[in-house]
From Swiss-Prot:
The lineage of its organism: Eukaryota, Sar, Alveolata, Ciliophora, Intramacronucleata. The gene is rpl14. One of its GO terms (biological process) is translation. The keyword Transmembrane does not apply. InterPro entries: Ribosomal_uL14 (IPR000218), Ribosomal_uL14_sf (IPR036853). It comes from Nyctotherus ovalis. This is Large ribosomal subunit protein uL14m. Pfam families: Ribosomal_L14. SUPFAM superfamilies: Ribosomal protein L14 (SSF50193).
Protein backbone atom coordinates (compact mmCIF):
# COMPACT_ATOMS: atom_id res chain seq x y z
CA UNK A 1 0.00 0.00 0.00
CA UNK A 2 1.51 3.27 -1.17
CA UNK A 3 0.39 6.80 -0.34
CA UNK A 4 1.66 10.34 -0.93
CA UNK A 5 5.24 11.19 0.12
CA UNK A 6 6.29 7.54 0.18
CA UNK A 7 9.89 6.89 -0.86
CA UNK A 8 10.25 4.07 -3.39
CA UNK A 9 13.14 2.27 -5.08
CA UNK A 10 13.37 1.87 -8.85
CA UNK A 11 13.67 -1.70 -10.14
CA UNK A 12 14.75 -1.05 -13.76
CA UNK A 13 17.92 0.21 -15.42
CA UNK A 14 16.62 3.69 -16.28
CA UNK A 15 19.27 5.50 -14.20
CA UNK A 16 17.16 6.49 -11.18
CA UNK A 17 17.69 4.87 -7.77
CA UNK A 18 14.97 6.38 -5.55
CA UNK A 19 11.76 8.34 -6.17
CA UNK A 20 9.08 10.00 -4.01
CA UNK A 21 5.34 9.81 -4.71
CA UNK A 22 3.38 13.06 -4.85
CA UNK A 23 0.15 11.95 -6.59
CA UNK A 24 -1.85 8.72 -6.67
CA UNK A 25 -4.32 7.65 -9.36
CA UNK A 26 -7.30 7.82 -9.15
CA UNK A 27 -6.93 11.10 -7.28
CA UNK A 28 -9.59 10.46 -4.62
CA UNK A 29 -7.78 7.40 -3.23
CA UNK A 30 -5.41 7.84 -0.32
CA UNK A 31 -3.73 4.43 -0.54
CA UNK A 32 -3.06 2.48 -3.77
CA UNK A 33 -2.11 -1.23 -4.15
CA UNK A 34 0.30 -3.10 -6.41
CA UNK A 35 -0.31 -2.52 -10.13
CA UNK A 36 -1.34 1.13 -9.79
CA UNK A 37 0.13 4.19 -11.49
CA UNK A 38 1.54 7.05 -9.37
CA UNK A 39 3.27 10.37 -10.12
CA UNK A 40 6.78 10.67 -8.75
CA UNK A 41 9.77 12.96 -8.38
CA UNK A 42 13.28 11.51 -8.76
CA UNK A 43 15.35 11.90 -5.58
CA UNK A 44 18.52 9.88 -6.26
CA UNK A 45 20.24 8.93 -9.54
CA UNK A 46 23.27 7.02 -10.80
CA UNK A 47 26.01 9.53 -11.62
CA UNK A 48 27.35 8.91 -15.12
CA UNK A 49 30.02 11.59 -15.05
CA UNK A 50 31.10 13.57 -11.97
CA UNK A 51 29.99 16.91 -13.43
CA UNK A 52 26.59 15.55 -14.53
CA UNK A 53 27.20 15.95 -18.27
CA UNK A 54 26.15 13.55 -20.97
CA UNK A 55 28.75 11.52 -22.85
CA UNK A 56 29.31 12.59 -26.43
CA UNK A 57 27.42 10.41 -28.89
CA UNK A 58 25.33 8.79 -26.18
CA UNK A 59 21.76 8.26 -27.44
CA UNK A 60 20.00 7.27 -24.21
CA UNK A 61 18.33 10.12 -22.35
CA UNK A 62 19.68 10.60 -18.84
CA UNK A 63 17.25 10.95 -15.96
CA UNK A 64 17.88 14.05 -13.84
CA UNK A 65 17.25 14.69 -10.18
CA UNK A 66 13.88 16.32 -9.34
CA UNK A 67 12.47 15.16 -12.69
CA UNK A 68 8.76 14.28 -12.50
CA UNK A 69 6.99 11.44 -14.25
CA UNK A 70 4.73 8.41 -13.90
CA UNK A 71 5.70 5.12 -12.31
CA UNK A 72 4.05 1.77 -11.90
CA UNK A 73 4.05 -0.05 -8.53
CA UNK A 74 5.51 -3.56 -8.81
CA UNK A 75 6.45 -4.58 -5.24
CA UNK A 76 5.28 -3.43 -1.81
CA UNK A 77 6.35 -4.30 1.71
CA UNK A 78 2.68 -4.61 2.71
CA UNK A 79 1.42 -8.20 2.69
CA UNK A 80 -0.55 -9.27 -0.39
CA UNK A 81 -3.06 -12.03 0.49
CA UNK A 82 -4.07 -14.71 -2.03
CA UNK A 83 -7.25 -16.82 -2.17
CA UNK A 84 -5.42 -20.04 -1.27
CA UNK A 85 -4.27 -18.52 2.05
CA UNK A 86 -0.72 -17.61 1.05
CA UNK A 87 0.64 -14.11 1.60
CA UNK A 88 3.41 -12.38 -0.31
CA UNK A 89 5.61 -9.67 1.15
CA UNK A 90 8.67 -7.95 -0.34
CA UNK A 91 11.45 -6.25 1.61
CA UNK A 92 11.17 -2.88 -0.20
CA UNK A 93 8.65 -0.83 -2.14
CA UNK A 94 9.68 -0.82 -5.81
CA UNK A 95 8.40 0.81 -9.01
CA UNK A 96 9.03 0.86 -12.76
CA UNK A 97 9.34 4.23 -14.49
CA UNK A 98 6.76 4.72 -17.24
CA UNK A 99 6.17 7.31 -19.93
CA UNK A 100 3.11 7.53 -22.15
CA UNK A 101 3.39 8.05 -25.86
CA UNK A 102 0.13 8.23 -27.86
CA UNK A 103 -1.77 6.20 -25.29
CA UNK A 104 0.74 3.32 -25.24
CA UNK A 105 2.92 2.64 -22.22
CA UNK A 106 6.61 2.79 -22.97
CA UNK A 107 9.03 1.81 -20.21
CA UNK A 108 12.16 3.88 -19.65
CA UNK A 109 14.38 0.96 -18.67
CA UNK A 110 15.04 -2.11 -20.81
CA UNK A 111 15.61 -4.54 -17.94
CA UNK A 112 13.72 -5.36 -14.75
CA UNK A 113 15.50 -6.43 -11.59
CA UNK A 114 13.75 -8.78 -9.18
CA UNK A 115 10.35 -10.42 -9.09
CA UNK A 116 6.85 -9.24 -9.97
CA UNK A 117 3.48 -10.25 -8.55
CA UNK A 118 0.53 -11.88 -10.28
CA UNK A 119 -1.37 -8.59 -10.08
CA UNK A 120 0.93 -6.91 -12.62
CA UNK A 121 0.84 -9.73 -15.18
CA UNK A 122 -2.14 -8.82 -17.36
CA UNK A 123 -2.95 -7.85 -20.94
CA UNK A 124 -1.86 -4.23 -20.42
CA UNK A 125 1.68 -5.29 -19.52
CA UNK A 126 2.47 -7.54 -22.48
CA UNK A 127 4.58 -4.69 -23.86
CA UNK A 128 6.74 -4.78 -20.72
CA UNK A 129 7.57 -8.47 -20.86
CA UNK A 130 8.15 -8.33 -24.63
CA UNK A 131 10.80 -5.63 -24.11
CA UNK A 132 12.50 -7.47 -21.26
CA UNK A 133 12.98 -10.81 -23.03
Amino acid sequence: MIQKFTNLYVTDNSGAIAVRVFQTYPGNRKIVPVGSIVRHSVKKIHRILPWGKQLRGRRKRIICRSQCGRSWIVQTSYQIPYIDGATLRFSKNRVLLVKRKRGIRIYRGRRIYGLTTRAVNNERTINLFRICI
